[in-house]
Amino acid sequence: MGLGKKLSVAVAASFMSLTISLPGVQAAENPQLKENLTNFVPKHSLVQSELPSVSDKAIKQYLKQNGKVFKGNPSERLKLIDQTTDDLGYKHFRYVPVVNGVPVKDSQVIIHVDKSNNVYAINGELNNDVSAKTANSKKLSANQALDHAYKAIGKSPEAVSNGTVANKNKAELKAAATKDGKYRLAYDVTIRYIEPEPANWEVTVDAETGKILKKQNKVEHAATTGTGTTLKGKTVSLNISSESGKYVLRDLSKPTGTQIITYDLQNREYNLPGTLVSSTTNQFTTSSQRAAVDAHYNLGKVYDYFYQKFNRNSYDNKGGKIVSSVHYGSRYNNAAWIGDQMIYGDGDGSFFSPLSGSMDVTAHEMTHGVTQETANLNYENQPGALNESFSDVFGYFNDTEDWDIGEDITVSQPALRSLSNPTKYGQPDNFKNYKNLPNTDAGDYGGVHTNSGIPNKAAYNTITKIGVNKAEQIYYRALTVYLTPSSTFKDAKAALIQSARDLYGSQDAASVEAAWNAVGL
C-alpha cells in the first residue's frame, strides 16, 4: 500500500523487499540469500526456535521475542481472523492489525508454519505507524454511518431491495488510510441490493465528521462490453432434481451436499434471484431455457474443477450455495459476481451473445467468489488487476482449448482478452506499459481490466514453461495462502515463486521468476 510497513519475511530470497530469512528453517528448500534486497533484515536479528505448539498464543509469543525486528511487540497489534492447514501440512495464520481494538482496513499479516512447527514465512502489512497517524475520534454510530453512505450513493433504504431477502448492509469501525498517507477512524459500510440494479457498494465514512473517504461499487464482471455467438444447441447432461411434480435446475449431486441452483429473471432487473428454472419433463429444450442450461452445466463443471483439483467446496469452501440468474435485464452486456451470486445478461446481439454461454467467463466469475473469500484483493489499481487476472487465469484452466477469454460469447471481435497476446485486445503485456488510469468508475478503478494483461502474460509464460498441472496448483496456493487485499504485482510474483518452491522446488520456482521477469517485474 505504501501507507504502512510492507512486511515480507521468508526463507525464500524471492519474497521481494523487506525479506527476512529465518535460520534453521526449511520449506521445500533453503536457497542462498540475496544480500542486496531493499531494507534487508539479516537473519541473525531473529530469535528462532521451534514453536512449543502451533497456536495463536505460541505465535504471538514468537513475535514478541522478535520485537526489535518488528519495531515493537506486534503480537499486541494483531487479531487472528483465520487459520488453515494446506495439503502440505503447513499451517497459515491470517491476522488483521488492530489499533485499540479497531481493525486496520485493507491490511493483513499472514504467518506460515511448516510441518516441524517452525515459522518459515511472514508476509503482509503490519502498519506500525497507524496509531500515530489516527487523527480523529468516533462520534457517529453505525446507523448514522449507514445513512451517510446511502446519501453518498444517491439511494435510500426504501428505494432499494433484495427481493424477498433482507437488506445485506453492515457498518464496521476500522482505521482507514486517507490519500495524504494518514489514518482516520472510519466505518467500512457495505450496501448490497439487486433492485433497481445489482450493486455491491463499499463506502468508507469518517467516524467523526461523516465525510465520505471513498466509495466503490464492487460488482465484479468479466467485461462491460463484448460480443458473442448464439448458444450452440449442443446436448449436454444436466444434474437436476424433481420437485412437486416438475423438474428444476437444482444440482444435488455433489458429494459435499453443495447445491448449484439456476434461476430465470425473465429480463427483469429486480426480484433476484428470480424464478427457479423448471420443466414438466427432465428435458430443458426451449429457446428461453438455453442460457440457463449453459449456466447450470458450466457451473457444475467449474465446481468439479475446484473440488477435484484443490478439494475446495464451493466458492467459500464451506459448501455455500452456488446461485446463477440468467436473462438479467434487456440486452444486458455483462456477466457479474455480485457478492453472493452470479448474474448473466443476454447481450445485445451485436457485441455479446448470452454471456452464460462461455465456460471461461463462468469460471472467471466463480473465481471472483473464491478471491472474495480468500485473498479478497481490493478491486482497484494493481490489486484489482490481479483480481481480474486470477479470474482470467482460472478461466483458462477451466477451458484450455485456447488462450482467449470469452471467445464463445463475442460477436464483433474474436474474444475479450488473450493470455498469450494481451496487446491484441488493447492490454499491456509488460510493466513498462502499465496504464496509470484514474481510480474511478470511468477509469475502470485504475484500469483493472486493462492492466490485468501484464500478470496474464506472466501466467502464459509460466504455463508454457512448466505446464498446466503445476501452474494451476501454484496459482491456487498463491491466491489462498499468500496474497492479501492490497497485494501488488511484485507481491503476486513473490507469492507465486514461494508457492512454486513450496510445491515443486527451486527449478520450477526459477521458471516462475523468469516468467515475471519477462514482463518487466
Swiss-Prot record:
Any single GO BP term: proteolysis
Entry binding sites for Ca(2+) 4: 411
Keyword Amino-acid biosynthesis: no
Signal sequence residues: 1-27
Cofactor note: Binds 4 Ca(2+) ions per subunit.
GO cellular component annotations of the record: extracellular region
Subcellular location, record wording: Secreted
Proregion positions: 28-221
Annotated residues for binding of Ca(2+) 1: 283
Annotated residues for binding of Ca(2+) 3: 399, 402, 407
Catalytic reactions on record: Similar, but not identical, to that of thermolysin
Keywords: Calcium, Hydrolase, Metal-binding, Metalloprotease, Protease, Secreted, Signal, Zinc, Zymogen
CDD domains: M4_TLP
Binding site for Zn(2+): 364, 368, 388
Activity's thermal dependence: Thermolabile.
EC numbers for this chain: 3.4.24.28
Positions of the catalytic residues: 365, 449 (proton donor)
Record family assignment: Belongs to the peptidase M4 family.
Main function: Extracellular zinc metalloprotease.
Protein name per the record: Bacillolysin
Species of the source: Bacillus amyloliquefaciens
Encoding gene (name): npr
